[in-house]
Structure formats: structure tokens, C-alpha cells
Amino acid sequence: MKPSSLIGALIAWLFVAAAAPAAAATITVHDIAGRDVTLEAPVKRILLGEGRQLVALALLHPHPASLLVAWSADMRRQDERLYDLYRAKFPLLDRVPFISRGSPDTFSVEQALAAAPDVAILSGGYGPSRRSDDVVHKLEAAGIPVVFIDFVEDPLTNTVPSMRILGRLLGEEARAEQFIAFYQSHMDRITTRLAAAKPAPPNVLMHAHAGHMECCNSPGRVTIGAFIDIAGGHNIAVDVLKQPAGRPSLDETMARGQLSLEYVMARDPDVYVGTGGLHLQALGGLVLGPGVDPATSREDLAKVVSKPGLDGLRAVRTGRVHGIWHLFNNVPFNFLAVEVMAKWFHPDLFKDVDPDESLRELNSRFLPVPLVGTFWISLDPKPAERGR
């Protein structure tokens, strides 16, 4: 072969090799349930046991819908506006079958098996959890690897490892590390300053799904309640809530439940934080989320704390009444909730922290579907507030 022909053949081979997809490699991930799971990656066919984890996939992969073969309907049920925004951005979602109506008891193992995923990513919440032994056994018996992630039950511990797991599964380790560095820098700014200043923590009432039920459903140090301590507050619920039945894997301090109005009035908290979302729109509760106007959220919040018992609390009398998007309890960018709460709890210490700017950077650098709406609100519009 002539040298010129040899060079031409070599160049052609290099082009073909560069265009060829990367071969799958066998990897082992250590999931948040403490299990070592071996599978081929990057995965091409994903089952999401909880639909809201699409947001986490979208942080890392440019076309997350192209990877989905089955998912749960919880995003559509809990935040239809967010669901519609993702459908508009990723039209392939309309072709992906739901295998659950958005609750663990409606999860169809048969439909999951029929979807033939490379991996089932489960996370509890509105889908099968690490306590769903029967579901896990059936999936694994059929040769489907099961990997657990978590942004809900213990977000402060599990957010970073969960994103690292997803990065490995998707072959997007570099992107995952970029997000983790961004996330950690925002969390460290809060925790480092609190550790140095050691301010007295205000007593905080977190009223979950505010306005939906009688006062007051409240988390302990689990789910969205986990952010109170790290933001420099004291959650009055952790002093009385006991371990719920059927949750042996959780510590007592991780409990959640109902606080009596009498207890709340006796504790007379310094700060009131209600959680809300679009799921409360038809229920007369606090509405926050994508596309929501801040005036609407502020009006809802005022109605909630005007109810007998709440209206006389110190937090209401002194204007320390706030609302936050409940879905922060199930997304990787929960650092926004921590920044906002830290500013509410210690406004002088964190007067230079700008959650609005943090959200703008998150939108520009990482989110393919920008968060635009009202995700936190105050009766006094001067503290941290989002409503663009």
C-alpha cells in the first residue's frame, strides 16, 4: 500500500473510531442504601421509581427523556406546571409509560419488567423505597439492577453521594462533580459562617403543606425539616415528635407528625415557615412554585397565619412569617432552601447572601428548564424573597 493510501486509511479509521459510541464498562456503585451494585454503564434505559428525580437527571444529561423507559406519575400529580414545563422541553416524555400513579402501592412490577430497563433508580418518597423488599427482589430476580438515591429522607447526607451515583450511571462524572462543587460552595458559605459566629438559634415552627389541614403538620429533622438546623434555627417539632410506626430505619429525631395548636402556642416560636406548592392550589393552602406570582403567595400566606391560634404567635406579631416551596425537599438544589432560611433566621449575619442570584446562577449553569416563579416568600417583602 502506498504511504498516501495508508495515511488515508488511518485517518478514515480514526474518524470512525471517534464517531463510534463508547463501549459500555462494568462499574460498581455504592448506593445510599449501603448496597454495592454492579452493572454496565453508561446506562441507556432507565426506570425512575419517583418521577420527580427527572429533575436530577436533567441536571446532568442533555436529553434525559431519551433515557427513560418507565417512570412514576408523581411529578404530574404533585406539580403539574413543572411537569408541563419538562414536557415542553423534552417532548419524548409523552412516549414514556407511567408504571405508578405516584405512590408505592400503585407501582406495577409487571410493567416495570416489561419496560426492560438497564437499571431501576429508586428513592422512596412517592415510589418504592429501600424497605420495599418484595419489589427489589422481583426486579433483581429478573436481572434488573436496582440503585437507590435520596434527596428526601436525609438530604443533608445523601444529596452529594446521590448526584455522584447518577454521574457514574450516566457517564457524566465531570458534570456531576461540577454541580457538586457548586452545591458544596453554597452550603459551606452558610455552615462556615454559622460555626464561626455561633448565633443563638431562633425557635422555628415549620408548618408543612400550610393551609391544607389544621395546625400543624410538621417535619422533625427529616425531609425539608432537615434544613432548619443547618440554617441556624431550632425546629420546635423535634422536641416532641416520636418515631412513627413502621419506620424502623429512622432515628427518633427524624420523625414527622402532627403538632397540637396548644403546643405551638405554648412554644410561641420566633419564626414561622410554611411550606407550599401547586398541589395546594385547589385546597386553599399556600401556593408556591413555577409561574406563581408573589402577590398570590403572599396573600395565601397571610390567610394561613390569620387563623385563630396562629395569629397571636410572636413570629406573626414581629413579622417573621415566611413560606417556602415544598418541592425543595426532593431536588438536588436544596441549598437554595438553606440559604433562604439562613437569611430569615439570621438576617444580619447573612445580609450579603443573595438567594435570587444563586437561583440565577443555577438556572444559567445547570437547569435546562429554568426555575421561574415564586419559591420563597415573606409577609414583609424586605427579607429574601423570590418572585420573578
What do the PLM-derived regions correspond to, one by one?
Residues 8-19:
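Bacterial N-terminal signal peptides
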